[in-house]
């Protein structure tokens, strides 16, 4: 299940040979560097890195420095083992073996290898993992799709959840009850997406359908099956 770290650029549309319109998500995936290789009996995985992070340095008195985290010496040392001059901005781990499928072919990679979009081909099925859009504190109508109360005959509880459980027995709210709360900003994996096009020159992958996350959000695209 080799994969690659990418950035969601947005959505567009493609047309197949029959003239049908296909909605697609465009994912930009610059070549990833293999930072570490895990190979045990129970786990075979790669640690991938992409982008570049600013390094720490001594600041002159009164000098204004840009905001954001800077890579420390441990991160730089880890990156130099893979032949990089700067620490990667984004690091993710990708599992190579498939649990429950011992016959699956496991690709071999070494520290410092590059992985680009050519690992995918049109027609393949992939799964995309990302962080959904954060929507803050929301009520049950938006968060869980409740129907709400009546809109007429003097009702004033249009978007309230209603009863949240029995009274005397058990005298508590059952765990897992759908109630208002924080909505979004969660890790989500969308499976069964088809690769429609691969543009190796521009490091782009066109995937049919929508993927989780906002524009410019970090995603991980992995082969499925």
Regions found by a protein language model. Name each.
Residues 1-225:
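Extended basic (Lys/Arg/His-rich) segments that typically form rRNA-contacting surfaces
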């Amino acid at each position: 299940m080799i994969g690659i770290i990418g950035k969601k650029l947005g959505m567009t549309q493609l047309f197949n040979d029959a003239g049908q319109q296909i909605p697609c998500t465009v994912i930009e995936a610059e070549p990833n560097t293999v930072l570490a290789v895990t190979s045990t009996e129970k786990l075979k995985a790669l640690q991938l890195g992409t982008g570049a992070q600013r390094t720490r340095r001594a600041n002159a008195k009164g000098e204004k420095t840009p905001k954001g985290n800077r890579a420390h010496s441990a991160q730089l040392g880890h990156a130099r083992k893979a032949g990089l001059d700067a620490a990667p901005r984004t690091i993710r781990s990708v599992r190579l073996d498939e649990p429950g499928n011992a016959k699956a072919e496991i690709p071999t990679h070494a520290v410092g290898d590059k992985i680009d979009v050519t690992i995918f081909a049109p027609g393949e099925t992939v799964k995309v993992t990302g962080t959904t859009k954060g929507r803050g504190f929301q009520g049950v109508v938006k968060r869980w799709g409740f129907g709400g109360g009546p809109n007429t005959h003097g009702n004033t509880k249009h978007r309230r959840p209603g009863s949240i459980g029995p009274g005397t027995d058990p005298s508590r709210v059952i765990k897992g009850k759908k109630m208002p709360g924080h909505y979004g900003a969660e890790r989500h994996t969308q499976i069964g997406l088809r690769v429609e096009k691969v543009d190796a020159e521009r490091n782009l992958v066109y995937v049919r359908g929508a993927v989780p996350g906002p524009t410019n959000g970090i995603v991980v695209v992995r082969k499925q099956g």
